[in-house]
Amino acid sequence: MKIRASARKICEKCRLIRRRGRILVICSNPRHKQRQG
């Protein structure tokens, strides 16, 4: 899980999701997991 100032899609399988006021990226590739904060 990477914590970034701006979470964005890396590949076309990445999905931007908002959970508990945080923006998350989930993907089939575990390296692409990110959180904004």
Swiss-Prot record:
GO terms for biological process: translation. It is found in: Plastid, Chloroplast. It holds the Pfam family Ribosomal_L36. Keywords: Chloroplast, Plastid, Ribonucleoprotein, Ribosomal protein. Disulfide bonds: none annotated. InterPro entries: Ribosomal_bL36, Ribosomal_bL36_sp. Belongs to the bacterial ribosomal protein bL36 family. This is Large ribosomal subunit protein bL36c. It comes from Piper cenocladum.
